[in-house]
Design a protein with these regions (language model features):
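Domain-length functional cores that host ligand/cofactor binding and catalytic or interaction surfaces
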Residues: 141-151, 183-190, 196-207, 211-221, ...
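Bacterial N-terminal signal peptides that target proteins for export
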Residues: 2-12
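Structural beta-strand segments of beta-rich domains
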Residues: 50-54, 331-333
Length: 454
């Protein structure tokens, strides 16, 4: 998301990262009077070099991402006694299968251990349970030319240093990492990695996130490789202020790039580091006809922890009064649509049974309309206790915007999905009238019927 970080602030942030790295290491050393509690371990016997992931089914009793001081237990993952990464059990009391990337491990016998990391855990979060460990093994290809798309994606997935001012604060943590495989016109192959964070402490305000993006998590592309003729010709990442930069930083566990979260809106640096690092295991997402937000639908817990962080940070209210506050995310209708904008922007109105007025995604604010093209989401706040069966219509409306343009139209408009979150934060898709794409001029509308009455 857009935010400004001046060069001085960036230098200060890097210095802060170094300071926190030293400070947190000192703190950890002060808490070693008792050996860390082992939760689980697994012996790996590899007949060849492998890229290894780990699935950990775990829970942390009596914790909640919403409760200050009891947010989560941290566990430390090591390979042959050496630090690999930390993992925060952000799903709390619920059993959840966390997947992490360990990196390339050489042929032979190895021990993977998961231990309680008390210094990194919340003050009132002191226990964790591990039901199972499962290794995820991928043959390590000797070079990019002979690797499959999956082998490439696994071998180059990034490890992320935590932003220093998030350590022990349980904010803006990475939840999921996915990758896309893109084939471009010049026959280049691009593998791009994107991470879903719980939220962003800087950048777009919460209500604007919901209106323009249909979520309050932060979703950022992190890193990508470009291949031509089977050879990697370029590695880039998203730098501070959304600048695309060439990756020249260090690597770990094979070819995995080390990047640090380096700004309040979760952009990255290949120079900084901190005392804590994460490596969510990447899964493939096919988003040619879907939004980035749709990956969250596969893991409903991400909606819950999104809401819990907002609750803890006092950004959820029964009566939102400013741009940084929203209602309970379960009180919104989430609309997934597609359009190609030319000097125009889209907004949506929702009509519900028994309500005289419609409810608008832009809340009457032109800056909350959607002016980007492609597939996108928005979220429309509805009255409390409205059920999916109460939703009658969704109206798309096109508006001219202030950007220079030879023509002003919303082209190829279509609403493709509508959903609401149930009480357990599970997305429930609403029946939606199927319509062909349409083009709208300024002030023109298109109505889509919702529900069984269509």
């Amino acid at each position: 998301m857009n935010t400004k970080l001046k060069p001085f602030h960036f230098v200060l942030l890097i210095l802060t990262l170094v300071f926190f790295s030293v400070a947190t290491k000192v703190r950890a050393s002060q808490d070693t009077s008792q050996p860390p509690k082992s939760l689980a371990s697994e012996i790996l016997v590899l007949s060849q070099n492998m890229e290894v992931g780990l699935e950990i089914e775990a829970r942390s009793p009596n914790t909640s991402w919403a409760r200050k001081g009891a947010e989560a237990v941290a566990v430390l993952i090591s390979v042959d006694g050496k630090y690999n990464q930390d993992l925060l059990l952000w799903a709390g009391d619920e059993w959840f299968r966390y997947r992490v990337m360990l990196g390339r491990i050489l042929k032979g016998k190895h021990t993977v251990s998961v231990t309680l990391n008390t210094p990194r855990s919340a003050a009132a979060a002191r226990s964790a349970e591990v039901k199972s460990l499962r290794s995820l093994l991928f043959t390590a290809s000797p070079d990019a030319a002979n690797a499959s798309e999956e082998q490439l994606a696994v071998a180059y997935s990034p490890f992320l240093y935590a932003r220093a001012n998030t350590i022990d604060r349980f904010t803006d943590i990475p939840l999921l990492t996915y990758y896309e495989v893109l084939r471009e016109a010049n026959n280049d192959l691009v593998v791009r990695y994107t991470t879903v964070f719980t939220n962003e402490d800087g950048g777009t305000q919460t209500a604007a996130l919901m209106a323009r993006w249909g979520r309050a998590t932060d979703i950022e592309w992190v890193y990508q490789i470009r291949l031509h003729g089977g050879k990697i010709i370029e590695e880039t990442y998203q730098g501070v202020e959304h600048e695309t930069k060439f990756f020249t930083g260090p690597r770990t566990a094979g070819n995995h790039p080390l990047l640090a979260v380096a700004s309040e809106n979760n952009n990255f640096s290949d120079l900084a580091c901190s005392a804590v690092r994460f490596a969510p295991f990447p899964f493939r997402a096919r988003l040619e006809t879907a939004t980035r937000e749709s990956v969250m639908d596969l893991y409903p817990q991400t909606y819950r922890v999104m809401a819990e962080e907002l609750i803890r940070e006092k950004r959820i209210s029964d009566a939102p009064a400013d741009i940084n506050t929203i209602a309970d995310p379960r009180e919104y209708l989430y609309i997934e649509a597609t359009s190609e904008q030319e000097g125009a922007a889209l907004a949506f109105d929702v009509k519900v049974n028994g309500q005289f007025k419609s409810f608008a995604s832009d809340m009457g604010e032109p800056r909350l309309r959607i002016d980007r093209s492609g597939y996108f989401r928005t979220a429309v706040r509805l009255p409390r206790d409205i059920s999916p069966a109460d939703v009658e219509t969704i109206t798309a409306r096109c508006h001219a915007n202030q950007k220079p343009a030879s023509e002003r139209r919303c082209n190829r408009v279509n609403v493709v999905r509508a959903l609401m979150l149930d009480q357990g934060y599970v997305p429930r898709v609403l029946p939606l009238q199927t319509q062909p794409e349409s083009s709208l001029g300024p002030d023109e509308i298109r109505v889509y019927r919702v529900g069984s009455q269509q």
